[in-house]
């Protein structure tokens, strides 16, 4: 008897688990198929979650009802807030994960989720009828039928591990690769590219001389990614910092001809922002040293991840490199680093919902779309799961805009601009950074998560209470006038401010650069009555009000452009006035509105003006008809 589901998810990595959970939580009967049930949410590369931009994505996933934040909050060994000396737009959390505990906790969550079924199996083929996906077929011939399919295969598609002059078929960490499914996607007509990533050696902690390294402790205050977390892990493990040196670089130089990167064995394009150590040596040969972070992989293992030493050099050369590094001279290498090549699809073949343009009800998410990183994968998986379930159940799909979330920036970049290298999310990619902050992810997205059925009534009530407290406190400070008495003047001068000439509203005093919410309470001789996150919002929203309002005005302009819809089936070849390059790019991307069209590389303002004229005169509809 053939089993039938609403949604099937292929893969159970960081994209797959979020896709499966989101689909199930929206009420869709969901099947998750994975090559190995023991490797759900496996971390084949760095044992960490978060960092610049990425940490904000994890908060956004949580605000929308996803899982990654809750799981890392329960299983981390260290957590730090980055960029605390900078403005709120670039602050982000980063956690070191206990990679085994993270897997176990995520597997438990998946197994307990209603509507979500898990099965070990390798999908070889999609079942397609009339350009619409109808299910999948495994390598042993079992068929599972469904109304939608989400592919989240990570680096498994035609994966090949490269180490020195050796190259062999493999998924990450020497798991089985997925070869036949990649062939199937090619046969269906998808444009496929070849990308590469890599991982460093792991060493035995007992053999490291930590006295020669610099300790990197976690924060000594409770931190969490999830807005629901109330219990914090304060018993943390440190990381350690060391450096390469001239000796290390000589080993690399002497053996560069053995690197698959430079021997011609690697054909795939590697990540720009996470280069191998040999690539760093060649590209930045003026630098006398490179940072290496020693990151424990968990509480119950001696394996330490040498971040910054990603390499495809032969194993014996990796040992030689380690012997030159302070603290690692006698380190016992437990796993060698390696490079891995894999297939990815050209992401401009997707709609912003992550549904493929070619095959109806087929979605892709994660590294198959050309991204790098667990967080980028999880964000895409969440949205693919939300949209696949929403489409088959007719409960609505959701497209995040560039002003809604970093996840929106990520997906828009992929489907509008494409990528010719593994895509990494950076704060610099977001034009509305001040709106897309770590601290306000819940204020931006919890309403949306609730509307999608991903947020519980209890959580939504707590969120609304927080929002009301923020608004009430801003109003209260706007009504309090502070007098320029000696008590006030002394506190202001103590904190480097200039004396008041007249009375001032508390909210206006808070706007001064040197003032904080704590100082305002000190002047008012009041105790803390609100949660720290409420106080933080009051301070940030007050201090940055002018800049935030400017950003919101820019967003409104773009929204007006987004409201100018373009028919999906528009035949651009019939619009004679368009430049040839613009016609080709518009035909490839098929933008849904004028705003998206304006972001396509090769489409200039003159082309947008022509589209606007056609739109305003009603010609676009006639061209599409």
From Swiss-Prot:
Query: What Gene Ontology biological process does one annotation of this record name?
Result: tRNA methylation
Q: So which domain of life are we looking at?
A: Bacteria
Q: Which SMART domains match?
A: GIDA_assoc_3 (SM01228)
Q: Which cofactor does it need?
A: FAD
What InterPro entries does the record tag this protein with? FAD/NAD-bd_sf (IPR036188), GIDA_C_N (IPR049312), MnmG (IPR004416), MnmG-rel (IPR002218), MnmG-rel_CS (IPR020595), MnmG_C (IPR026904), MnmG_C_subdom (IPR047001), MnmG_C_subdom_sf (IPR044920)
Q: Where does NAD(+) bind?
A: 270-284
Q: State the Gene Ontology terms under molecular function.
A: flavin adenine dinucleotide binding
Q: Provide the protein's localization.
A: Cytoplasm
Gene Ontology cellular-component terms for this entry are: cytosol
Primary location group = cytoplasm
Q: What are the TM regions of this chain, as residue ranges?
A: none
Q: Where does the chain bind FAD?
A: 11-16, 123, 178, 367
Tell me the keywords, alphabetical order: Cytoplasm, FAD, Flavoprotein, NAD, tRNA processing
Q: Does the keyword Ligase apply?
A: no
Quaternary structure and partners = Homodimer. Heterotetramer of two MnmE and two MnmG subunits.
Per the similarity annotation, which family is this? Belongs to the MnmG family.
Its annotated function is as follows: NAD-binding protein involved in the addition of a carboxymethylaminomethyl (cmnm) group at the wobble position (U34) of certain tRNAs, forming tRNA-cmnm(5)s(2)U34.
| The protein's name in its UniProt record | tRNA uridine 5-carboxymethylaminomethyl modification enzyme MnmG
Q: Which organism is it from?
A: Staphylococcus aureus (strain JH9)
Q: What is the lineage of its organism?
A: Bacteria, Bacillati, Bacillota, Bacilli, Bacillales
Q: Which gene encodes it?
A: mnmG
